[in-house]
Regions:
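Residue-level detector of alpha-helix initiation sites
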Residues: 76, 136, 177-178
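Glycine/serine-rich phosphate-binding loop and adjoining beta1-alpha1 elements at the start
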Residues: 2, 8, 79-169, 298-300
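Rossmann-like adenosine-cofactor binding region
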Residues: 209-291
Length: 370
């Protein structure tokens, strides 16, 4: 197959769909790879690293979309890219459709085959293609939040890790999944006071086994969330419902309970955010203030560390891409129920129930579209 890797065009997005090492593997399997000129430059991958393993460098994204059987990206197709997607073309990338009605409509009209990294599953019901970026975003969330707490960023003027004789700040993490766990790694390392909120008692026990008394576990149905939000210097939103819009756990009235200059980092913003007042921002303009609370809602946080993120992502996405390229999408999907779970839109039909439900589309069994 002919595999195309366009340069990412979302603002301040510096990752790329494939590393040179991944390209080398695909070419060894007999496939052709087209990479847009300087597509990997910001992630530290030069054109000659791609050509040295057999890739063809293409000057225009249009030519990649015109020629490739499979488009491999990182972020969801932007408006200009959606217009170039062809019927029956395979699009393999993060999509986050439950928070993107216009994109969903565009992909339906394109009659393409859209496989979303974030809904591919594994034998344990986890999301292995989402996990690497969730880990990166979780770790970055505390770094970003700590920076936003500085006075010149309109924060409280508080050093999250404290100082000799001075207590550190309080971090409240909503969600004990991959984002929450990795946020806790950094927050506990900074010696902040860390609360982790999750609905699963079993998951909280796992986190206590990992972190010991460095965290305070909070079961969501047994706490007063208002009180906990009021204590937070830094609130991390890391709640996920696979493929669906994130639940709004923190409402606008709850902001009035928070300290002036406290910070919210809503990692769930890709899926609409778990804070009512959240709206997507960019690395270039990452924050806004509502009711004296700083909101950091960058929708592509891992794009700020593109080299680490690209390598981590490829480790997870490449094995499935090889299956798709070697077998064709229909056989690859029908042979693997976990990859099939990634099929969100196929040839004009919505094949992921959470997306169909949120926008009122008819849900079609993905196997019936192959």
């Amino acid at each position: 197959m002919k595999i195309g890797v366009p340069k990412e065009i979302k603002p301040q997005e510096h990752r790329i769909g494939l590393t040179p090492e991944s390209v080398k593997t695909l070419i060894s399997e007999g496939h052709e790879v087209l990479v847009e000129n300087n597509g990997g430059f910001e992630a530290g991958f030069e054109n000659d690293q791609y050509t040295s393993v057999g890739a063809k460098i293409v000057d225009k994204a249009e030519d990649i979309f015109n020629d490739a059987d499979i488009i491999v990206k990182v972020k969801e197709p932007q408006a200009g890219e959606v217009k170039m997607i062809r019927e029956n073309q395979i699009v393999y990338t993060y999509l986050h459709l439950a928070a993107a009605k216009e994109l969903t409509e565009g992909l339906i009209k394109s009659k393409s085959v859209c496989i979303a990294y974030e809904t591919v599953t594994d034998n344990n019901g986890r999301l292995p293609l989402l996990a690497p970026m969730s880990a990166v975003a979780g770790r970055m969330s505390v770094q970003a939040g700590a920076h936003c707490l500085e006075k010149n960023q309109n924060g409280r003027g508080l050093l999250l890790g404290g100082a000799p004789g001075v207590e550190g700040g309080t971090v409240v993490i909503l969600g004990g999944g991959v984002v929450g766990e990795n946020a806790a790694v950094i927050a506990t390392g900074m010696r902040a006071k860390v609360h982790i909120v999750d609905k699963s008692e079993a998951r909280l026990k796992q986190l206590v086994e990992m972190f010991g008394d460095k965290i305070i576990p909070e079961q969501s149905d047994k706490i007063d969330l208002n009180k906990l939000v009021a204590e937070a210097d830094l609130l991390i939103g890391g709640v996920l419902i696979p493929g669906a819009e994130a639940p709004k756990l923190v409402t606008k009235p709850m902001l009035k309970l928070m300290k002036r200059g406290s910070v919210i980092v809503d990692v769930a913003i890709d899926q609409g955010g778990c804070v009512e007042t959240s709206k997507p921002t960019t690395h270039g303009d990452p924050t806004f203030i509502i009711d004296d609370v700083v909101h950091y809602c960058v929708a592509n946080m891992p794009g700020g560390v593109p080299r680490t993120s690209t390598i981590a992502l490829n480790t997870a996405t490449l094995p499935h891409l090889i299956k798709i390229a070697n077998k064709g999408y229909a056989k690859a999907l029908s042979d693997d129920k976990h990859l099939l779970a990634g099929l969100n839109v196929c040839k004009g039909q919505v094949t992921y129930k959470a997306v169909a439900d949120v926008f009122g589309y008819d849900y079609v069994d993905p196997l019936k579209t192959l």
